[in-house]
Amino acid sequence: MESLALLPTLSLSTTTTTSKATAFLRSSTTSLHHRRPHLSLSLSSTPKPTLTFSSHSHSHSLSSKPLLALKPLNATASSSSSPATTSPPPTKSGAKLIPLILSVSVGLLLRFAVPKPAELTPQAWQLLAIFLSTVAGLVLSPLPVGAWAFLGVTASVVTKTLPFPTAFCAFTNEVIWLIVISFFFARGFVKTGLGDRIATYFVKWLGKSTLGLSYGLTISEALVAPAMPSTTARAGGIFLPIIKSLSISSGSLPGGESRKKLGTYLIMTQFQSAGNSSALFLTAAAQNLLCLKLAEELGVKIASPWVFWLKAASLPAFVALLLTPLILYKLYPPELKDTPEAPALAAEKLKNMGPVTKNEWVMVGTMLLAVSLWVFGEKIGVSSVVAAMLGLSVLLLLGVLDWNDCLNEKSAWDTLAWFAVLVGMASQLTNLGIVSWMSGCVARSLKTMNLSWPAAFGILQAAYFFVHYLFASQTGHVGALYSAFLAMNIASGVPGVLAALALAYNTNLFGALTHYSSGQAAVYYGAGYVDLPDVFKMGFIMAVINATIWTVVGGVWWKILGIY
């Protein structure tokens, strides 16, 4: 789940006594003959995983090693150091009072202060009030998202707005379970080290210059994206550790002026590229699957969705991925242009990692099986969720994952809880006529302006995109607004498939607007390499550039494909 409210952020804590001790190697003529420490990710069931530099050498050690520690989420990135053993102050339990009052007030005001339209039933109006309070809670976060969603579905049952089976009907939804299983695949990539190995190979092949290094990281993310549906997992589990290790080895440290040598550019480029990687594949982000499910409930059905999604996204996403590192190289340039040591560092890291393990090969084979079934499964009667279930079963049977790994993947179970609540409410809003009534009102307003469907399409897409400044979750945005905006598009005469795909692609692209707009945003900003004003400035500039690329290139490509 790409939600800021539930994410820890990464900050640097060092125990070094000299700047040399923070590098992968000491600057000596014989440094390549020593084992270099490399990054490893340690995950546990505790809420505070740690990232550490470790050395696989049994005969050499560093007297002081850089230590990366996950800290609780802050509003700002800090460069100050603190002991890794310092315990955070105890957090206050229970709901936050002011966000709670505001969230509940939204629904109460609609229910009791706003006259019910004659076209709607009391049940529909009451469900809309509960839904709006639920959505307000997603934005204001009086409680964690899953807890607040549970309160929302409880309210719908207690008030007899929905019967229990109807309120919980979405918990059997195939798409939601596909999302849950995809989180387990992501854990497999991290646990086996396969994702880290893939990214390191691209650093070795393309890392002689800063620009080449950026392209290597961008390409590697695009390759692992279809099997890792969480941009947060990709950012925190694979790419941020690699970027930080490369930056530190080049003397680019977070917090100070040296960060501009390499770290700021790599962080910003990876951050801005991630949205296009997520938009490229249906299974590259959890919200993609939710978008298509909500579209289907409004009558927009796409045959062979995995293939069709990839075909439609391929050209605009490829152009955007190709241009993003180059554009940022001009607009947000690194001080260090050449990184001749990066391939050597990557080669040494691969040497320390050793040969590909059995579990990595199993992971490769399993993902090839799953992706093949996602592409061709419909022809042999295997649905996407069944393909994912088969893949997870293989990983469990062969010991790549154990059941505790699945149980400890809290984001998966949390996603199941609140996705199901939102999908269930959204489907009932459609069944009770709320969505059609709302979209009809907007469509009539647009028609009074004598707008053609392309003009209405542009206005609605822009509104859907930039309203994300009010959200801290991509999936929360989808659950709150996707159905309504899709219905408005359709009512305005926009072809259904075009509107559904464009809204879904935009959902990935606006994840880089701010430091709170997505899970990966919090991870990358929390690393301490970019200033907050730069995040907002470059976020807006790249949003306009991406919108232009997807509108021009995508518009022509979709016309060729016959989507409209």
UniProtKB/Swiss-Prot annotation:
Protein's UniProt keywords contain Plastid: yes
The species this protein was found in: Spinacia oleracea
Biased composition (Low complexity): 39-58
InterPro entries, A to Z: CitT-rel (IPR030676), SLC13A/DASS (IPR001898)
Pfam families the UniProt entry points to: Na_sulph_symp
Record GO cellular component, one term: chloroplast envelope
The protein's role, per its UniProt record: Glutamate/malate translocator involved with DIT1 in primary ammonia assimilation and in the re-assimilation of ammonia generated by the photorespiratory pathway. Exports the end product of ammonia assimilation, glutamate, from plastids to the cytosol. The precursor for ammonia assimilation, 2-oxoglutarate, is imported from the cytosol by DIT1.
GO biological process: L-glutamate transmembrane transport; malate transmembrane transport
Predominant localisation class: plastid
UniProt-recorded Gene Ontology molecular function terms: L-glutamate transmembrane transporter activity; malate transmembrane transporter activity; oxaloacetate transmembrane transporter activity
UniProt keyword annotations, A-Z: Chloroplast, Membrane, Plastid, Plastid inner membrane, Transit peptide, Transmembrane, Transmembrane helix, Transport
Subcellular location: Plastid, Chloroplast inner membrane
NCBIfam families the record matches: dass
Entry protein name: Dicarboxylate transporter 2, chloroplastic
Tissue specificity: Expressed in leaves.
Transit peptide: 1-22
Mode of membrane association: Multi-pass membrane protein
Residue stretches spanning the membrane: 94-114, 127-147, 166-186, 235-255, 262-282, 307-327, 356-376, 380-400, 415-435, 451-471, 484-504, 538-558
Keyword Chloroplast set for record: yes
Family: Belongs to the SLC13A/DASS transporter (TC 2.A.47) family. DIT1 subfamily.
Classification lineage: Eukaryota, Viridiplantae, Streptophyta, Embryophyta, Tracheophyta
Sequence segments annotated as region (Disordered): 35-58
Superkingdom to which the source organism belongs: Eukaryota
